[in-house]
């Protein structure tokens, strides 16, 4: 049995949700209604996020990148946590509902690209189009966009010990099949609603301390 860590990006690795930051800065007012319909699960994540990015003109690409480089903050303890998982030969994957044009630059030098799974964007037309290279498999019908539970099934064996780290509704399906969940913010609410056991965290120091204890118990 191996331990595998599947970690969200927006609002988890970063302190802020970068998609929401983009929408607040660059999207028209109607983005707020779409966002609320995603959070209430009236819209699927795939439908909602597609609609949000269709509100953003592609000629803002460089401004968006510069804005995120200046405002995105990596959560406290993440650098040390990555060093810890590498030293202990723990498999680590970023499974992000975020977009390639900002996830890759913000993680450059921290996580190898082949360990990052995110959505793709097309800037060739007037408005941003989102492509979905990691859709739901036959076991998930939630139209997740990037399906985290499907990726977990694809990247691991059933006898592996699965750890999910996340903060929002987009992490719920993955949390349902995890052996251990680290949750913060809205994911805590959803875990409690769905009777999913979780450990709250605010920094990756919290996660590392708990994971170190878990390794000692497992060994």
Curated annotation (Swiss-Prot):
GO terms for biological process: L-methionine salvage from methylthioadenosine. It is an enzyme of class 3 (hydrolase). Keywords: Amino-acid biosynthesis, Hydrolase, Methionine biosynthesis. Its EC number is 3.1.3.87. GO terms for molecular function: 2-hydroxy-3-keto-5-methylthiopentenyl-1-phosphate phosphatase activity. It catalyses: 2-hydroxy-5-methylsulfanyl-3-oxopent-1-enyl phosphate + H2O = 1,2-dihydroxy-5-(methylsulfanyl)pent-1-en-3-one + phosphate. Pathway: Amino-acid biosynthesis; L-methionine biosynthesis via salvage pathway; L-methionine from S-methyl-5-thio-alpha-D-ribose 1-phosphate: step 4/6. Signal peptide: none annotated. Dephosphorylates 2-hydroxy-3-keto-5-methylthiopentenyl-1-phosphate (HK-MTPenyl-1-P) yielding 1,2-dihydroxy-3-keto-5-methylthiopentene (DHK-MTPene). PANTHER family: PHOSPHORIC MONOESTER HYDROLASE (PTHR28181:SF2), UPF0655 PROTEIN YCR015C (PTHR28181). Belongs to the HAD-like hydrolase superfamily. MtnX family. This is 2-hydroxy-3-keto-5-methylthiopentenyl-1-phosphate phosphatase. It comes from Bacillus cereus (strain 03BB102).
């Amino acid at each position: 049995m191996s331990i595998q860590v599947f970690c969200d990006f927006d609002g988890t690795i970063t302190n802020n949700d970068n998609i929401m930051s983009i929408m607040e800065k660059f999207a028209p007012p109607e983005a707020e209604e779409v966002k609320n319909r995603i959070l209430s699960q009236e819209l699927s994540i795939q439908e909602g996020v597609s609609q949000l990015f269709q509100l953003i003109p592609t000629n803002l690409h460089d401004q968006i990148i510069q804005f995120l480089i200046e405002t995105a903050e990596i959560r406290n303890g993440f650098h040390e946590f990555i060093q810890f998982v590498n030293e202990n030969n723990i498999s680590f994957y970023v499974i992000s509902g975020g977009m390639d044009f900002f996830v890759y630059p913000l993680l450059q030098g921290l996580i190898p690209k082949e360990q990052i799974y995110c959505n793709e964007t097309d800037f060739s037309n007037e408005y941003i189009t989102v492509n979905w290279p990691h859709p739901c498999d036959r076991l998930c019908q939630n139209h997740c966009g990037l399906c985290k539970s499907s990726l977990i099934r694809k990247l691991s064996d059933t006898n592996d010990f699965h750890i999910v780290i996340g903060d929002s509704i987009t992490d719920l399906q993955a949390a349902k099949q995890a052996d251990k969940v680290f949750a913060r913010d809205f994911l805590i609410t959803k875990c409690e609603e769905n009777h999913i056991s979780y450990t709250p965290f605010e920094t990756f120091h919290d996660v590392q301390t708990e994971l170190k204890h878990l390794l000692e118990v497992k060994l």
